Amino acid sequence: GARRWNERMAKLSRGLEASRATLVKAPGNPIRHYDVAELEGLPPPVHRYFLAVLKDGQPIVSAVTIEMTGTMNMSATAEQWKPFTSTQRVVTAAAGARSGFIWNARISMLPGIGVRVVDSYVAGKGLLQAAVLGLFTVADMEGEGEMARGELMRFFAETPWYPTALLPSQGVRWSAVNETSARATLADGPNALTLLFHFDAAGMIDSVRADARGGMVGKEMVMRPWECGLSDYQSHDGM
């Protein structure tokens, strides 16, 4: 089971890293850095946010690996929290690479019984697969359209973990809403979406909202309002 699962992850990873590998090998490709001058004209809460989280000259994050532990509610109607561990690999749009991520997790359902789960956005396609012990498939959804948009939405909502990905130079377009909120638009190929970012009293992003995100209810995809909350900010690598 583990071997088969690892082979799947290796294939996905090759796809994720492909555009970045081409970029890194390109002759004369400069290392890019954040320039505070690009904040000119941004909505006030967005301007304040970048001044708070970035220093002039900060290297643009091109890729990151995140180790996670936590609990996940396995039911939409009851409290069924299960522990999980995971590794997430992210590639941003830095200097022309294609945005994407792979979340490779193990959820402990019962003692000795784990479910392997992968959630990803690679080369413009979304993927969600789950297999008991990495062998017996219990969920398998892949494709473009709303599936891809939903996974790109996850990528976009998690960008405060690597905030240079939210800069205008990285393809994000900001529009004003009020003193504590702004809308941001991101496009990747045919997939484009706009999310509402809200900023707290300290200037940090505390929520990211979408009017609708697809989620599976039984065998049908249902569009529902969606929100990601953020808190407990810490400094990493100068950000």
PLM region descriptions:
Residues 9-65:
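N-terminal leader/targeting segments and the immediate start of mature chains
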Residues 82-84, 168, 178-180, 191, ...:
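Residues that act as N-cap/strand-start positions at coil-to-secondary-structure junctions
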Residues 129-188:
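Flexible, processing/modification-adjacent segments and terminal tails
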Residues 111-117, 137-142, 194-196, 217-222:
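A short, polar/proline- and glycine-enriched secondary-structure boundary/capping micro-motif
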Residues 183-239:
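Gly/Pro-enriched, hydrophobic low-complexity segments
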Residues 1-4:
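Hydrophobic membrane-insertion alpha-helices, especially the h-region
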Residues 47-136:
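N-terminal mature ectodomain segment of secretory-pathway/periplasmic proteins
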